[in-house]
Curated annotation (Swiss-Prot):
The modification 1-thioglycine is found at G98. It comes from Candida glabrata (strain ATCC 2001 / BCRC 20586 / JCM 3761 / NBRC 0622 / NRRL Y-65 / CBS 138) (Yeast). Pathway: tRNA modification; 5-methoxycarbonylmethyl-2-thiouridine-tRNA biosynthesis. This is Ubiquitin-related modifier 1. One of its GO terms (molecular function) is protein tag activity. The lineage of its organism: Eukaryota, Fungi, Dikarya, Ascomycota, Saccharomycotina. C-terminal thiocarboxylation occurs in 2 steps, it is first acyl-adenylated (-COAMP) via the hesA/moeB/thiF part of UBA4, then thiocarboxylated (-COSH) via the rhodanese domain of UBA4. GO terms for cellular component: cytosol. The gene is URM1. GO terms for biological process: cell budding; cellular response to oxidative stress; invasive growth in response to glucose limitation; protein urmylation; tRNA wobble position uridine thiolation. InterPro entries: Beta-grasp_dom_sf, Mopterin_synth/thiamin_S_b, Urm1. It is found in: Cytoplasm.
Amino acid sequence: MVKVRVEFLGGLDVIVNKQRVYDLDVPSQVENVGDLIDYIIENLITNKKDVEVFIENDSIRPGIITLINDTDWELENEKEYVIEDGDVISFTSTLHGG
């Protein structure tokens, strides 16, 4: 098991039971951020219609900033980043209704 903190900010918490922060013990099969995204879809997004708010074309939807330990995930090899104990993964929506 690996302990990670996952944050859903900028209104994204509505797709994960309106909880902004999750401290998770993820199974050892969850090796990288891509695996973590799959884990989130399977275990945290209860209404499967909300998956399209989070994912588009097998990646995080444009308009969602993804940070790994406060660093843009594009600098950390995106979905291939290997998760380590204590990592903080943040998803922040920049899109808001008006």
